[in-house]
Regions:
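Core catalytic lobe of class I
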Residues: 1-228, 233-236
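S-adenosyl-L-methionine
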Residues: 1-14, 239-257
Length: 257
Protein backbone atom coordinates (compact mmCIF):
# COMPACT_ATOMS: atom_id res chain seq x y z
CA UNK A 1 0.00 0.00 0.00
CA UNK A 2 1.31 3.43 -0.94
CA UNK A 3 0.00 6.95 -0.30
CA UNK A 4 1.41 9.91 -2.25
CA UNK A 5 0.27 13.53 -2.55
CA UNK A 6 2.00 15.61 -5.23
CA UNK A 7 2.21 19.41 -5.28
CA UNK A 8 1.53 19.49 -9.01
CA UNK A 9 -1.19 19.56 -11.64
CA UNK A 10 -2.78 16.21 -12.45
CA UNK A 11 -1.87 16.79 -16.10
CA UNK A 12 1.73 15.98 -15.15
CA UNK A 13 0.89 12.53 -13.74
CA UNK A 14 3.22 10.70 -16.15
CA UNK A 15 6.35 12.10 -14.53
CA UNK A 16 5.53 10.26 -11.30
CA UNK A 17 5.03 6.79 -12.75
CA UNK A 18 1.91 6.09 -10.71
CA UNK A 19 -0.25 3.01 -11.46
CA UNK A 20 -3.65 3.24 -13.12
CA UNK A 21 -6.65 3.62 -10.84
CA UNK A 22 -9.60 1.37 -10.17
CA UNK A 23 -11.40 4.48 -8.93
CA UNK A 24 -10.89 8.17 -9.65
CA UNK A 25 -12.79 10.32 -7.18
CA UNK A 26 -12.80 14.09 -7.04
CA UNK A 27 -14.67 17.20 -6.02
CA UNK A 28 -14.55 19.67 -8.91
CA UNK A 29 -14.98 23.45 -8.37
CA UNK A 30 -18.66 24.39 -8.24
CA UNK A 31 -18.16 27.53 -10.37
CA UNK A 32 -19.41 29.75 -7.57
CA UNK A 33 -16.79 32.39 -8.35
CA UNK A 34 -16.98 35.39 -6.06
CA UNK A 35 -20.08 33.99 -4.37
CA UNK A 36 -18.36 30.99 -2.80
CA UNK A 37 -19.35 32.09 0.70
CA UNK A 38 -22.77 33.51 -0.20
CA UNK A 39 -25.52 32.58 2.30
CA UNK A 40 -22.74 31.40 4.63
CA UNK A 41 -22.10 33.23 7.94
CA UNK A 42 -18.39 33.34 7.07
CA UNK A 43 -19.24 36.17 4.66
CA UNK A 44 -19.32 38.38 7.79
CA UNK A 45 -16.85 38.93 10.61
CA UNK A 46 -17.58 36.36 13.35
CA UNK A 47 -20.64 35.28 11.33
CA UNK A 48 -22.61 38.43 12.26
CA UNK A 49 -23.64 40.97 9.60
CA UNK A 50 -23.54 43.69 12.25
CA UNK A 51 -19.75 43.32 12.24
CA UNK A 52 -19.41 43.97 8.53
CA UNK A 53 -18.01 41.81 5.76
CA UNK A 54 -15.06 39.49 6.37
CA UNK A 55 -12.07 38.91 4.10
CA UNK A 56 -13.97 36.00 2.54
CA UNK A 57 -16.80 38.19 1.27
CA UNK A 58 -16.88 38.35 -2.52
CA UNK A 59 -14.12 35.77 -2.85
CA UNK A 60 -13.74 32.35 -4.44
CA UNK A 61 -12.53 29.43 -2.35
CA UNK A 62 -9.29 29.29 -4.37
CA UNK A 63 -7.85 31.17 -7.36
CA UNK A 64 -7.72 27.90 -9.30
CA UNK A 65 -11.52 27.75 -9.15
CA UNK A 66 -11.72 30.39 -11.89
CA UNK A 67 -9.83 28.52 -14.60
CA UNK A 68 -10.85 24.90 -14.07
CA UNK A 69 -11.11 23.23 -17.48
CA UNK A 70 -13.52 20.31 -17.32
CA UNK A 71 -12.69 19.09 -20.84
CA UNK A 72 -9.02 18.73 -19.89
CA UNK A 73 -10.04 17.14 -16.62
CA UNK A 74 -11.95 14.33 -18.34
CA UNK A 75 -9.23 13.85 -20.94
CA UNK A 76 -6.66 13.16 -18.24
CA UNK A 77 -8.99 11.22 -15.93
CA UNK A 78 -9.67 8.80 -18.75
CA UNK A 79 -5.92 8.18 -18.91
CA UNK A 80 -5.61 7.85 -15.13
CA UNK A 81 -8.17 5.04 -15.00
CA UNK A 82 -7.45 1.40 -15.77
CA UNK A 83 -8.60 0.09 -19.13
CA UNK A 84 -11.94 -1.64 -19.36
CA UNK A 85 -11.58 -5.09 -17.83
CA UNK A 86 -12.49 -8.14 -19.91
CA UNK A 87 -13.90 -10.02 -16.96
CA UNK A 88 -17.21 -9.10 -15.43
CA UNK A 89 -17.33 -7.02 -12.25
CA UNK A 90 -13.82 -5.56 -12.56
CA UNK A 91 -14.41 -2.39 -14.59
CA UNK A 92 -13.12 0.91 -13.14
CA UNK A 93 -15.19 4.03 -12.60
CA UNK A 94 -15.01 7.68 -11.66
CA UNK A 95 -16.99 9.58 -9.03
CA UNK A 96 -17.40 13.34 -9.36
CA UNK A 97 -18.93 15.54 -6.69
CA UNK A 98 -20.62 18.52 -8.34
CA UNK A 99 -23.50 20.91 -7.86
CA UNK A 100 -26.99 19.93 -8.99
CA UNK A 101 -26.80 22.55 -11.75
CA UNK A 102 -23.51 21.14 -13.05
CA UNK A 103 -24.78 17.61 -13.59
CA UNK A 104 -25.95 17.97 -17.24
CA UNK A 105 -22.62 19.57 -18.18
CA UNK A 106 -20.61 16.87 -16.40
CA UNK A 107 -22.62 14.11 -18.09
CA UNK A 108 -22.13 15.74 -21.51
CA UNK A 109 -18.34 16.07 -21.15
CA UNK A 110 -18.10 12.59 -19.65
CA UNK A 111 -19.76 11.06 -22.72
CA UNK A 112 -17.40 12.94 -25.04
CA UNK A 113 -14.47 11.29 -23.27
CA UNK A 114 -15.76 7.73 -23.23
CA UNK A 115 -17.85 7.64 -20.05
CA UNK A 116 -21.13 6.66 -21.67
CA UNK A 117 -22.98 5.69 -18.52
CA UNK A 118 -23.71 7.28 -15.18
CA UNK A 119 -25.50 6.78 -11.87
CA UNK A 120 -26.56 9.92 -9.96
CA UNK A 121 -26.25 9.71 -6.19
CA UNK A 122 -27.16 12.12 -3.40
CA UNK A 123 -26.05 12.70 0.17
CA UNK A 124 -28.48 13.96 2.79
CA UNK A 125 -27.28 16.38 5.48
CA UNK A 126 -28.93 17.28 8.77
CA UNK A 127 -27.61 20.85 8.51
CA UNK A 128 -27.11 23.58 5.91
CA UNK A 129 -24.40 26.15 5.23
CA UNK A 130 -27.07 28.56 3.94
CA UNK A 131 -27.82 29.91 7.40
CA UNK A 132 -28.35 33.48 6.19
CA UNK A 133 -31.27 32.34 4.02
CA UNK A 134 -32.97 30.26 6.73
CA UNK A 135 -35.82 32.76 7.26
CA UNK A 136 -36.20 33.53 3.56
CA UNK A 137 -36.50 30.24 1.68
CA UNK A 138 -35.87 26.50 1.66
CA UNK A 139 -32.15 25.93 2.17
CA UNK A 140 -29.89 23.41 0.51
CA UNK A 141 -28.92 20.37 2.57
CA UNK A 142 -28.00 17.91 -0.17
CA UNK A 143 -24.73 17.03 -1.87
CA UNK A 144 -24.63 15.54 -5.36
CA UNK A 145 -22.29 13.20 -7.19
CA UNK A 146 -22.16 11.14 -10.38
CA UNK A 147 -20.73 7.65 -10.74
CA UNK A 148 -19.36 7.58 -14.30
CA UNK A 149 -18.28 4.49 -16.21
CA UNK A 150 -17.49 3.47 -19.78
CA UNK A 151 -19.31 0.34 -20.97
CA UNK A 152 -19.41 -2.34 -18.29
CA UNK A 153 -20.82 -1.83 -14.83
CA UNK A 154 -17.99 -1.07 -12.39
CA UNK A 155 -16.72 -3.29 -9.60
CA UNK A 156 -19.43 -3.40 -6.96
CA UNK A 157 -19.09 -4.62 -3.37
CA UNK A 158 -22.55 -4.69 -1.86
CA UNK A 159 -22.19 -7.79 0.37
CA UNK A 160 -25.45 -9.06 -1.16
CA UNK A 161 -27.34 -6.08 0.25
CA UNK A 162 -29.22 -3.43 -1.69
CA UNK A 163 -27.42 -0.07 -1.81
CA UNK A 164 -29.67 2.94 -2.37
CA UNK A 165 -28.75 5.98 -4.45
CA UNK A 166 -28.90 8.25 -1.41
CA UNK A 167 -26.43 8.24 1.47
CA UNK A 168 -26.16 9.83 4.90
CA UNK A 169 -23.76 12.77 5.02
CA UNK A 170 -22.06 11.98 8.30
CA UNK A 171 -19.66 14.64 9.52
CA UNK A 172 -16.23 13.59 10.77
CA UNK A 173 -15.22 13.82 14.40
CA UNK A 174 -13.16 17.04 14.57
CA UNK A 175 -10.92 15.48 17.19
CA UNK A 176 -9.95 12.73 14.77
CA UNK A 177 -10.09 14.36 11.33
CA UNK A 178 -8.96 17.99 10.86
CA UNK A 179 -11.13 20.33 8.79
CA UNK A 180 -8.68 22.24 6.58
CA UNK A 181 -10.58 22.88 3.33
CA UNK A 182 -13.84 24.86 2.77
CA UNK A 183 -15.39 22.11 0.61
CA UNK A 184 -13.75 19.12 2.32
CA UNK A 185 -15.75 15.92 2.03
CA UNK A 186 -16.04 13.74 5.17
CA UNK A 187 -13.62 10.83 5.34
CA UNK A 188 -16.50 8.62 6.48
CA UNK A 189 -18.47 9.41 3.30
CA UNK A 190 -15.46 8.84 1.06
CA UNK A 191 -14.68 5.54 2.78
CA UNK A 192 -18.18 4.27 2.06
CA UNK A 193 -17.79 5.02 -1.66
CA UNK A 194 -14.28 3.58 -1.84
CA UNK A 195 -15.27 0.32 -0.18
CA UNK A 196 -18.20 -0.09 -2.60
CA UNK A 197 -16.19 0.38 -5.80
CA UNK A 198 -12.75 -1.00 -4.88
CA UNK A 199 -11.09 -3.91 -3.12
CA UNK A 200 -8.23 -3.82 -0.65
CA UNK A 201 -5.01 -3.25 -2.58
CA UNK A 202 -6.70 -1.37 -5.43
CA UNK A 203 -5.57 2.11 -6.47
CA UNK A 204 -7.58 5.30 -5.86
CA UNK A 205 -6.61 8.64 -7.46
CA UNK A 206 -7.88 12.13 -6.61
CA UNK A 207 -6.75 14.58 -9.34
CA UNK A 208 -7.77 17.66 -7.31
CA UNK A 209 -7.01 16.39 -3.82
CA UNK A 210 -7.49 19.54 -1.75
CA UNK A 211 -7.34 18.53 1.92
CA UNK A 212 -6.22 14.99 1.09
CA UNK A 213 -9.30 13.46 2.71
CA UNK A 214 -9.71 11.02 -0.20
CA UNK A 215 -6.18 9.75 0.33
CA UNK A 216 -6.77 9.37 4.05
CA UNK A 217 -10.00 7.46 3.46
CA UNK A 218 -8.25 5.11 1.02
CA UNK A 219 -5.34 4.61 3.42
CA UNK A 220 -7.66 3.66 6.27
CA UNK A 221 -9.21 1.00 4.01
CA UNK A 222 -5.92 -0.47 2.83
CA UNK A 223 -6.02 1.00 -0.68
CA UNK A 224 -3.11 2.71 -2.38
CA UNK A 225 -3.90 6.33 -3.19
CA UNK A 226 -2.37 9.17 -5.19
CA UNK A 227 -3.45 12.79 -5.29
CA UNK A 228 -2.53 16.09 -6.93
CA UNK A 229 -2.90 19.53 -5.36
CA UNK A 230 -1.54 22.65 -7.06
CA UNK A 231 -2.09 25.09 -4.18
CA UNK A 232 1.12 25.09 -2.11
CA UNK A 233 -0.51 26.14 1.15
CA UNK A 234 -3.23 23.51 0.89
CA UNK A 235 -0.68 20.87 -0.09
CA UNK A 236 1.39 21.70 3.00
CA UNK A 237 -1.68 21.61 5.27
CA UNK A 238 -2.77 18.26 3.85
CA UNK A 239 0.67 16.74 4.36
CA UNK A 240 1.00 18.14 7.88
CA UNK A 241 -2.49 17.63 9.29
CA UNK A 242 -4.43 15.15 7.16
CA UNK A 243 -1.73 12.74 6.05
CA UNK A 244 0.93 13.06 8.74
CA UNK A 245 0.24 9.61 10.16
CA UNK A 246 0.11 7.78 6.83
CA UNK A 247 3.69 6.49 7.02
CA UNK A 248 3.14 5.12 10.52
CA UNK A 249 -0.04 3.28 9.55
CA UNK A 250 1.44 2.06 6.27
CA UNK A 251 4.47 0.65 8.07
CA UNK A 252 2.26 -1.08 10.59
CA UNK A 253 0.24 -2.70 7.82
CA UNK A 254 3.35 -3.79 5.96
CA UNK A 255 4.83 -5.18 9.17
CA UNK A 256 1.64 -7.18 9.76
CA UNK A 257 2.08 -8.86 6.38
Amino acid sequence: MKIELFNDNFQNFKRYGIPKAQLVIADIPYNLGNNAYASNPMWYVDGDNKNGESKKAGKAFFNSDYNFNIAEYFHFCNRLLKKEAKERGQAPCMIIFCSYQQQPMVIEYAKKHGFKNYIPITFNKNYSAQVLKANMRIVGATEYALVLYREKLPKFNNNKKMIFDHFEWKRDNKNLVPNIHPTQKPVSVLKRLIEIFTDEGDVVIDPVAGSGSTLRAAMELGRSAYGFEIDRKMYALAKEKMLSDVKIQTNLLEFAK
